[in-house]
């Protein structure tokens, strides 16, 4: 479900704050979420008690089993909370915390992000703690409603930026599931990346085999849209450092 996030109308670079270096961490991620998320993200506010309770249980279980990896407890809690799906609490897809948060992150809504900076400190520091995955091809599925934007912006040879937190998967079948949410005609991205962070060992939904690409992930379109059965396919390769001199 997170795969569809971040298809910007104009996939260009957008400056973003370094929350790890510029934010004084609060004493408790859990308390920070309880105190700040309801007003900052009212769409998901009704689910905050459930999100906090479930994230606490999942994180505690992983800590007890020695499955926290390099993450500290607060970082693990923040990451688990990001992966939760409020449909398990009777919510709608658009009420998901990760969707509401990522919408504001893609918009670079300074005031809202400032209200969420304590949580983002722990989430981004968790991503920084995880080692980059070796370069390989990951998959991302988006429904057919995104096709017009993709046709306009993802021409072969172009560079694109994904401004938010982007979810991809090691499992192509997961991407196909997301791409088919609105029926045939969705798009499966093949993303060759070397900076992804595998979060599925710490996720509340590990079956999605989720890998996160950090904000402003830059790639070039190595192969434009092609039709493959019920799906369109598009190939991206993570770009190297800029060679422009200003």
What do these predicted ranges mean?
Residues 41-202:
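Internal glycine-rich, Lys/Arg-flanked active-site/core loops of soluble domains
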Residues 1-39, 43, 199-246:
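Conserved NAD+-utilizing ADP-ribose enzyme module
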């Amino acid at each position: 479900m997170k795969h569809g996030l971040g298809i910007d109308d104009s996939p260009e670079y957008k400056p973003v704050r370094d929350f790890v270096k510029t934010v004084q961490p609060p004493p408790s991620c859990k308390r920070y979420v309880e105190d700040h998320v309801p007003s900052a993200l009212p769409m998901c506010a009704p689910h905050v008690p459930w999100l906090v309770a479930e994230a606490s249980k999942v994180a505690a279980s992983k800590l007890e089993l020695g499955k926290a990896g390099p993450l500290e407890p607060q970082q693990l809690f923040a990451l688990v909370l990001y992966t939760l799906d409020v449909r398990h609490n009777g919510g709608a897809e658009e009420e998901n915390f990760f969707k509401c948060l990522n919408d504001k992150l893609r918009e670079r809504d300074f005031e809202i992000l400032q209200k969420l900076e304590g949580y983002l400190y722990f989430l981004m520091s968790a991503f920084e703690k995880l080692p980059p995955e070796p370069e390989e091809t990951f998959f991302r599925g988006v429904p057919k409603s995104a096709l017009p934007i993709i046709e306009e912006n993802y021409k072969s040879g172009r560079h694109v930026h994904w401004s938010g937190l982007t979810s991809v998967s090691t499992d192509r079948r997961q991407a196909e599931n997301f791409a088919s949410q609105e029926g045939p005609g969705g798009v499966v991205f093949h993303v060759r990346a070397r900076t992804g962070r595998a979060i599925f060992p710490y996720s509340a939904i590990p079956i999605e085999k989720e890998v996160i690409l950090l904000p402003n992930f830059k790639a070039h379109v190595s192969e434009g849209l092609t039709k493959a059965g019920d799906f369109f396919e598009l190939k991206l390769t993570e770009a190297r450092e800029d060679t422009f001199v200003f």
